[in-house]
């Protein structure tokens, strides 16, 4: 099987940030949460907040929007940002593993692309994390939880934080924009 990271790997950008800006343009009153979001980020940078708590502060706005409708509109407009090199080589057995929230990626990954998704589990009604952020070693744990006997043929990511998954793959690739290079020194 082939495994791909999502943001900056097969998607041109950060889907969470793009979604936030998309929502903010349509619901400008949500700017009221910006101080909380900035505070959460600063507390994370100083080691006071966990990554999960910082992201909960960021996603506080989802409680105040029609989430399904907004994600649907967002992906109608933004699925064009899925990179063409991925669409050309996509296989039904692919797995997308991402730190982005499941509520955001599910419709585009499972619906539009028709492949499996492992993502950060977030309660869509509260913005609270269910378990750990799907990042680094947690991606490996979540992969083996869902697919205990999987063999990774090819792995693609834009980030060295995905080295734990890259080490498990027969072939690993670093993606920079549309340039795909063999992952060295794993």
Label each region the model flagged.
Residues 1-46:
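Active-site neighborhood of HAD-like aspartate-dependent phosphohydrolases
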